[in-house]
Design a protein with these regions (language model features):
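Short active-site-adjacent helix-start/loop capping segments
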Residues: 47-49, 71-72, 85-88, 123-126
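Alpha-helical support elements that line or immediately flank enzyme active sites
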Residues: 78-108
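Structured core elements
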Residues: 38, 63, 78, 177-180
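Glycine- and acidic-rich phosphate- and metal-coordinating loops
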Residues: 75-82, 113-119
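N-terminal amphipathic/basic leader segments beginning at the initiator methionine
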Residues: 1-53
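Glycine-rich, mobile lid/loop segments that gate access to catalytic sites or pores
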Residues: 97, 102-187
Length: 187
């Protein structure tokens, strides 16, 4: 696939963000030989906000996040690339619930503080074990967020994207850094 003409010449040097840990892992669910799971762990007391699709048919992870965001706190975000877990019915809900409960147990948080995202093909259910069996190894790879693992995380969430996307901003005079990765537009 050709690199998008919108691709920057290099990935931004996203700084370490205190209280954020990242990990990536190759589950092999869809892709061979590349990371397709991304885990973000946030320090206790982190607050979450969200904007969700207006689709009448959101994915199972979107339904989960709409439900748990009402609590206002977040400790983790788990994203898998390759399967959107959309139009998967009860099977998709089981993947979401199993993933949240398993991950919460591994890092000692409440399942309601686990946020999930999936990207990829639509309408292909998969068993919860395809994702859950990789969580212990993924958790074992957690490291403080730095320039290298921000890039690895941005690459792990890619599907048909031709380049990884990330950005950050320092809030003047506060020492605060807002950082993020994305996928999609300008792929």
């Amino acid at each position: 696939m050709a690199l998008s003409p919108l691709a920057p010449s290099e990935f931004p040097a996203i700084p370490n963000v205190q209280g954020v840990q990242l990990a990536v892992h190759a589950s092999g669910m869809r892709y061979s030989g590349r990371d397709d799971l991304c885990l973000v762990v946030l320090s206790s007391g982190s607050i979450v906000g969200g904007a969700f699709t207006q689709s009448l048919c959101p994915s199972a992870p979107v339904d989960w996040c709409k439900k748990v965001i009402k609590g206002g706190s977040a400790r983790t975000l788990l994203c898998n690339a390759g399967n959107a877990n959309a139009f998967t019915g009860k099977a998709g809900q089981e993947v979401v619930e199993s993933s949240a409960i398993s991950l919460a147990g591994l890092i000692d948080v409440n399942p309601e503080d686990v946020f999930l995202a999936s990207t990829g093909v639509i309408g292909e259910p998969f068993p919860p074990s395809d994702l859950v069996e990789h969580l212990p190894e993924l958790v074992g790879k957690l490291q403080e967020a730095d320039q290298d693992n921000w890039l690895a995380a941005a690459n792990a969430i890619r599907t048909t994207d031709t380049f990884p996307k990330g950005s950050f901003a320092k809030i003047n005079g506060t020492g605060a850094v807002v950082a993020g990765i994305a996928k999609g537009s300008g792929m």
